Amino acid sequence: MARIAIEYCTQCRWLLRASWMAQELLSTFGTDLGEVALIPGTGGVFRITVDGDQVWERKADGGFPDISVLKQRVRDRVAPERDLGHVDRRDSEHTG
């Protein structure tokens, strides 16, 4: 089972944002996840990893992830066969 780590900046007060994203991932992926960890950091960090592989980094990716984009990136690593329902359909409507 996958381990997700969300490292967030305590100085920036991003705990609420990090915990909401953790809740969304747990609600979506449930027992496909072994752990979702919140890791306090500093210096404007907001990084999300799946089993040590970075799937989002605030500075490199230009801000915070839209939750549907984050779910797709996590899904691609954790359960590629999973249909995310409206998240996948909404994305295909915008690209097609």
Residue ranges and their predicted role:
Residues 1-96:
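Domain-level signature for proteins that mediate thiol-based redox and metal-cofactor handling
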